[in-house]
Amino acid sequence: MECQNDRKILLAFNQPITAKQVAGKTGIPEDTCSYMIAKFAKNGMATCLNPIAGNSRLYWLTESGKRCQKDLCRKLNLSYKEYDLPNIDWELYGWICFSHRSAVIKTLNAPMQPSKIKQTLRIQKPNIKISANNIRDVIRLLLTKKIVQPIKIKKKAHPRYELTDSGRIFRQLLINSNAHIGQNSSNHIYKTGDN
């Protein structure tokens, strides 16, 4: 790794992630992350898990990339743990990584109506531009993909929505993808240190 950005980006791979997620973790501009990840792929260090996607392309390290990451961790005195790639639909997960979809899924930690999702998002992410209609549209899309399911509650006119089993797996992946270098993740842990 010849530059600081290369090292930061390589260390950001705690699981399959998008260039936008790498940018959020490292503070490196998204365009630079996209360029560097494409360079990793060209050099055989990373591979795209959803190559037909137009947006939210997911990348993961090849065996060569994992060796480089492991060597870098050893060199920087960081702990390293191998990530077991789960057997999930990576095309679908890439689709979920789109901004509004991921925001709704990360917010659904209990059965909620779209209005409650909006209220929670307003507190958690005050700068997000999403309307109640956008949230209802996202919920409809997530229903068709079997990521959420409706829950009817007695004496309530409108259903609440909760994540299905696959939705909970996707939610955990989204949360882990936001873990910064040095933070613990349930699957991949680095000690703090300068990168």
Residue ranges and their predicted role:
Residues 1-5, 51-74, 153-176:
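Short, cationic-aromatic polyanion-contact patches
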Residues 28-42, 128-145:
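Short amphipathic alpha-helical interaction segments
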Residues 41-51, 143-153:
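A short, conserved structural fragment
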Residues 115-127:
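DNA-recognition alpha helix
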Residues 1-8, 77-106:
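Short alpha-helical segments that sit at the start of domains
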Residues 68, 79-88, 159-195:
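Phospho-regulated, low-complexity intrinsically disordered regions of nuclear gene-regulatory
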Residues 13, 37, 46, 59-61, ...:
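Fold-core signature of tandem repeat domains
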Residues 13-21, 107-116:
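Short capping segments at the starts of secondary-structure elements
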